[in-house]
Every structure is written in structure tokens, then in C-alpha cells.
Amino acid sequence: MKPQTRNTVVRMDPDTFFYDFYNRPILSDRNTVWLCYEVKMKTNDRSRPPLVAKILEGQVHFDPEHHAEMYFLSWFRGNLLQACKSSQITWFVSWNPCLNCVAKVAEFLAEHPNVTLTVSTARIYCYWKKDWRRALRKLCQTGARVKIMNYKEFAYCWENFVYKERKPFRYWDKFSGNYRFLRCKLQEILRHLMDPGTFTYNFTNDPSVLGRHQTYLCYEAEHLHSGTWVPLHQHRGFILNEASNNLSFPEGRHAELCLLDLISFWKLDPAQTYRVTCFISWSPCFSCAQEVAEFLHENPHVNLRIFAARIYDYRPGYEEGLLRLSWAGAPISMMKYSGFSHCWDTFVDHQGRSFKPWKGLNEHSQALSGRLQAILQIMGN
């Protein structure tokens, strides 16, 4: 389907702008998504303008094909991509992108490192729902900049995308309060701290636990500078495996592979050296261990350390997978008290409370460490 494109000659009606870009945090019956965009380009084709600015209209529809973000990607690939040496894309959207659109945007940015994206949204869609909060985090993790539209950006859209008849932009009642709320809410979402109960439930290192079907993975990256590892705070957070009912991954995707996706999105400098440390609730399965090993072979500038709370032994071949990781230069160890405490301090919304170990933590850690060493020794022989 071709995008329904409206250029800046035929602008948006003022009433439409005020109705659909109204920044009240909770709104109903706003089923149209407006995407006003600008593309600043560097190109060898002098016949092309350095700045393209237009409007796309999409629907909050179950079929992602009808989303404005998908229209834009289709339009950009078909019209500008081949001619661009580099481009800076800015979106001004009435609603932030959904998880499926974020996945497509992530693929697009990974495929085209010469493209940057800034998303300024008037509102956050269903900010209380986990999937939509995760969509915002994933969008940032891909390298896109996400922000709440402020007064200057509303005024800019009014000047460039609205048929205003020389009337200045006038903000509505409670505009500033709505903006402050949404800005704080976005910061809260992107801070991405785990609930204490979620951490304790999923990271308990009792090997006999049942019902822990999800894998949680906390990660932090460092850059080697003058012989010292310097934290990269922008590359820190936690992820979990993608459910099999997700449109982007019909068969599901394990947390380890999601981490590899993230590292690729970071666009790390191959001439530098980086270290990624992950704390994971289950050790990698054989298939994930293989893919991690291949990734490290293809990206020698990235080092990986893995600390696991428990050993995942539900599928055959897990022992070989653990050995494969060791051979690939990704040493795996079992989490100890210090690791659990570090995760609590770094990745959990602990509200100032210190980490309290659960019963048997040290005993389980020692037993699992002994079992891991035995596996590596036996398989190595």
C-alpha cells in the first residue's frame, strides 16, 4: 500500500492539529495517528532538496500496515534511501509507535547506520501497560532519541505543518502540567528499573524452583579507555525473552539473542574495545550459546561475561553449549552474593532498601558453581 502523503503545501487543519496533538495524558477516541516528519539529507544529487518535510496519516489499527510509521518507512525506502549519503529524520507524532512498528524501525536503523531518528511524541499511548512501556525502551535501545513534545516543538509544527493563516500558536489550558507529567513518566519508563518482587522471584538461585518460564537478563557495557574500563551508562538495563505471540517474533526469541540485537543497535566502534557483563536468571541453552559464540567471533571488539543464577538443563546439549561459550571467550560463572547485591543496587527499584539474601543463597551458589565446573571439565575432556 502506498503512503497517504500530504506535503507542506496542503497543510493540516488547525482544528485537526489541536484535536489530535492535544497533550492530555489520557484520551479516548483519538484513533488517528499523525506523523509530521522532516528529513535532512546529504546527497550527491543536487536536484534533491536538503530538507524534506511532509505529513503522514495513519490509524490505530490492529493491522500494522496502516500505521503511519510503516507508511514512512515505505516512502523513505522508495524515494530517498538510494540517494542519501546520510540523513537525520525527525518525527513529530500524536502517539508513540507500537511494539511492532518499533521492531521494524529497529531493523531499519540497524540496516542503515547512516540514518538517525528523533521521535517527539505529543502523548504516550497506554503508558501503564507493560508492552507499550517496553516498546518505548526498545525504541531508545535501537539508538533512536525519544522525547515528549515541548512548547517550541508544538509551535514549530504549527508553523510548518498547519494551515494557520498567520495566527500564532496558543497553547491550551494545562499544557505545561501535561508536559511535565508526560516528561516525568517517560523518564520513569526509560529508567527501566525492575520491581523488587520480580527480581527476587526470577533470580532466586534455588535449582528446584518451578514455574520460572521467563528469562531475565540484566546488562551493562563498558569501554576500555587508557587501560581502565569506563561504564557506558546509556547501555545499561534489563531485558527478557520475547513471547512467541509477538508479531515480530512468531516463534519467540530468547533474552540472550535480544541482547545480541541490542549490541548491534549500539553501533560500537570496531576500533575500540568493549565489555558487556550480563546477569541472567537462566544460563543459555545450546542454540543461544552457539549464536553468542558466532557473534563474538564476528565482533572481536566486544567481550562478554555471563553470570547466571541457575543452570538451564531442560533441553539436551546444554552442557556442550556452556563449554562452547567458554571456548568462545565468554566465561560463564554462577552468581554469588556480590552479583545479586550488585543487580539489586543497579537494576532494581529498591526505594533505598538494601539487598537481603534469601535462605540458602550461598549454599545454592556454591553447589551450582561446583556443578558448572564439573560440566566444563567433563565436556572439555
Swiss-Prot record:
Single GO cellular component term: ribonucleoprotein complex
Catalytic activity, reaction form: a 2'-deoxycytidine in single-stranded DNA + H2O + H(+) = a 2'-deoxyuridine in single-stranded DNA + NH4(+)
EC numbers, comma separated: 3.5.4.38
Region Interaction with DNA, annotated ranges: 210-212, 310-317
GO biological process annotation, one example: transposable element silencing
Cofactors, names only: Zn(2+)
Record has Cytoplasm as a keyword: yes
Binding site for Zn(2+) 1: H67, C98, C101
Annotated ranges, domain CMP/dCMP-type deaminase: 29-139, 211-325
Molecular-function annotations in GO: cytidine deaminase activity; RNA binding; zinc ion binding
Transmembrane annotation, as ranges: none
Site location (Interaction with DNA): N241
Localization: Cytoplasm; Nucleus; Cytoplasm, P-body
CDD domains reported in the protein's UniProt record: cytidine_deaminase
Function statement: DNA deaminase (cytidine deaminase) which acts as an inhibitor of retrovirus replication and retrotransposon mobility. After the penetration of retroviral nucleocapsids into target cells of infection and the initiation of reverse transcription, it can induce the conversion of cytosine to uracil in the minus-sense single-strand viral DNA, leading to G-to-A hypermutations in the subsequent plus-strand viral DNA.
Record family assignment: Belongs to the cytidine and deoxycytidylate deaminase family.
Name this polypeptide is given: DNA dC->dU-editing enzyme APOBEC-3G
Species for this entry: Saguinus labiatus (Red-chested mustached tamarin)
